[in-house]
Amino acid sequence: ADSRKPIWI
């Protein structure tokens, strides 16, 4: 949901 960081983090 947080587009500022990669989904795997």
Swiss-Prot record:
Cofactor note: Binds 1 Mg(2+) ion per subunit.
Primary localization: secreted
Cofactors named for this entry: Mg(2+)
GO molecular function: lyase activity; metal ion binding; toxin activity
Single biological process term from Gene Ontology: killing of cells of another organism
Enzyme Commission designation: 4.6.1.-
Signal peptide interval: none
Protein task: Dermonecrotic toxins cleave the phosphodiester linkage between the phosphate and headgroup of certain phospholipids (sphingolipid and lysolipid substrates), forming an alcohol (often choline) and a cyclic phosphate. This toxin acts on sphingomyelin (SM). It may also act on ceramide phosphoethanolamine (CPE), lysophosphatidylcholine (LPC) and lysophosphatidylethanolamine (LPE), but not on lysophosphatidylserine (LPS), and lysophosphatidylglycerol (LPG). It acts by transphosphatidylation, releasing exclusively cyclic phosphate products as second products.
Protein name: Dermonecrotic toxin LgSicTox-beta-LOXN8
Organism: Loxosceles gaucho
